[in-house]
Swiss-Prot record:
It is found in: Cytoplasm. Residues 8-297 form the tr-type G domain. GTP binds at residues 17-24, 81-85, 135-138. Disulfide bonds: none annotated. GO terms for cellular component: cytoplasm. InterPro entries: EF-G-like_DII, EFG_II, EFG_III, EFG_III/V, EFG_IV, EFG_V, EFG_V-like, G_TR_CS. Catalyzes the GTP-dependent ribosomal translocation step during translation elongation. During this step, the ribosome changes from the pre-translocational (PRE) to the post-translocational (POST) state as the newly formed A-site-bound peptidyl-tRNA and P-site-bound deacylated tRNA move to the P and E sites, respectively. Catalyzes the coordinated movement of the two tRNA molecules, the mRNA and conformational changes in the ribosome. Keywords: Cytoplasm, Elongation factor, GTP-binding, Nucleotide-binding, Protein biosynthesis. Belongs to the TRAFAC class translation factor GTPase superfamily. Classic translation factor GTPase family. EF-G/EF-2 subfamily. PANTHER family: RIBOSOME-RELEASING FACTOR 2, MITOCHONDRIAL, TRANSLATION ELONGATION FACTOR G-RELATED. Its main location: cytoplasm. The lineage of its organism: Bacteria, Bacillati, Bacillota, Bacilli, Lactobacillales. GO terms for biological process: ribosome disassembly. This is Elongation factor G.
Amino acid sequence: MAREFSLANTRNIGIMAHVDAGKTTTTERVLYYTGKIHKIGETHEGASQMDWMEQEQERGITITSAATTAEWKGNRVNIIDTPGHVDFTIEVQRSLRVLDGAVTVLDAQSGVEPQTETVWRQATEYGVPRIVFANKMDKIGADFYYSLSTLGDRLGANAHPIQIPIGAEDDFIGIIDLVTMKSEIYTNDLGTDIKETVVGSDEFNAELASLDFNAEEYTELANEWREKLIEAIADFDEDIMEKYFAGEEIPEAELKAAIRKATINVDFYPMLAGSAFKNKGVQMMLDAVIDYLPSPLDIPAIQGVNPDTDEEDERPASDEEPFAALAFKIMTDPFVGRLSFFRVYSGTLDAGSYVLNTSKGKRERIGRILQMHANTRKEIQTVYAGDIAAAVGLKNTTTGDSLTDEKAKIILESIEVPEPVIQLMVEPKTKADQDKMGVALQKLAEEDPTFRVETNPETGETVISGMGELHLDVLVDRMKREFKVEANVGAPQVAYRETFRAGTSARGFFKRQSGGKGQYGDVWIEFTPNEEGAGFEFENAIVGGVVPREFVPAVEKGLVETMANGVLAGYPMVDIKAKLYDGSYHDVDSSETAFKVAASLAMKEAAKTAKPAILEPMMKVTITVPEENLGDIMGHVTARRGQVNSMEAHGKSQIVNAFVPLAEMFGYATTLRSSTQGRGTFMMVFDHYSDVPKSVQEEIIAKNGRNAD
């Protein structure tokens, strides 16, 4: 079957924002207007189509990224609705990796919020073009121009309105399109009765006058903002610049094309206005998705590496190219089992065919191919370049794996996974629960790369790690509901890390003789601190075979295993370089095991002089409080070993930005609530790891039963 929509008429977009900005409601309206659903479900009533998990409907938030496909004016729009809560940041990250464009939804009252900054930064890292939708224009305190200023002030984004609202709050009645200079005026809240008029026309003047608005004022405002838009876009388009300086009229099509080009090049962010809940501005936002966000043909060919030659390669978006796709999400479906979501970059794929998982070097059979709408599905026979779909039957594929034609191998850039910052102990209630818990945790970890499951080597307890309390709360809840596992859950603990702060060299010597074959391993290793976030790096600098080549991997393995259980308090060690530069071996007694043990001894010896340190996660905390509570809040931050970075006024509130250790933030919601009579709010997002103070380090070591030496 031939493809239904051309690549030029395909859009792969994400809808992303801070929690509660109205992303899911916006997506619901998109589905309603594109004919995908025939009844609107409200998020706050737990009836949203895209928030299909029980936990999502109970909490009124998005937890997983739901995928759906819609059609708009002859175009296919593949949409991924992503979570806004910081604990589910991997869902945003893996979605952005496979999308071509995004709609950033702002709450028009608050503008850019902490998680907006996080998702914006992630989108910038992946070079994703964006349009901005100032939602909730009907809300008390909604301010389109304040929201615009926060894009520049907090994100440094070159954002400019391509629309301006007519009115705000209860008086939000319409939108002016600055490109076409036409207005849409809404006479009901269903988005069904829309009057379109030309700005400045008699009809426009009469319509606004009938609603008690000053038409002249809005005509003037529209002309002023259109002038600013042309001036901004002229920086990226010489033809428009020439016409602008010559005082010539700029045709609508030319202006649209220039905005599209600057947006796709990630130089410019068009800003729109609306209220998804009141059905205002959603159709215009859909038009902007088609007009300004890229098709798969507009973005550079996907880059990768040929695993056989290690040479760089690429796959242009075309059905004629060899098949290449990236698996970006694994999900367990109660009806069809394990689902692997993937984005096709090039070529086509039929159900029942074979592909090569080049990341794992394993052949996989594609059972069925499904087009997803949240958690419902439609079976399809073929997928084409630019499509997003889910496959049944992939046994070895995990998040970030490349799937390709067996005869044209390529490994695409994978998905970076952030380190977990919080952990807790889980204990099955019965023997039956113990057996089921292992399976449940394994399946949940397959779905979510930021969720880690480990066994404490000393106590045998199962420890689960994740991105925050809500993240682990939801996963434990899923374990109980979906897998029927009853478990006792410990209190949340901080996921500390350990590292070396000084360079040193150390010898690891292991020799054992007990009748028959002995054990002999001898290594000299130089340890140096690595850059933050760079992880562990191993270098083999052996010359002359003093440590035979076949034992070098065992040395690296011995170091990695030792680093999993750090030297100070048993926390994983990070950001260390190790250079194996000398050693000796025995012709008969040397073995992989002996060299593994020797490497482990070298690291423990190095710890005596390498100034080992414990690192703790530092959170970027944003606290919003009434002015009269500002003094209390500054006291809270200081008492929690925090550091205030900035303060800004917003209406009658003060916004405090600070870095605070995660360990000090447990229970802060209760403290803030009582200090502000429930009027204060806070958001936190992981920012970086930092050394704990010496006194705190000693407490941690004492608690974990280790000695500082």
